[in-house]
C-alpha cells in the first residue's frame, strides 16, 4: 500500500 505522500509525488 502507498502512503498519501507517495501518490501525490507521482
From Swiss-Prot:
The keyword Secreted applies. GO terms for cellular component: extracellular region. It is found in: Secreted. Its main location: secreted. Keywords: Amidation, Neuropeptide, Secreted. One of its GO terms (biological process) is neuropeptide signaling pathway. The modification Phenylalanine amide is found at residue 10. Coiled coil: none annotated. Belongs to the FARP (FMRFamide related peptide) family. This is FMRFamide-like neuropeptide FLP2. It comes from Penaeus monodon (Giant tiger prawn).
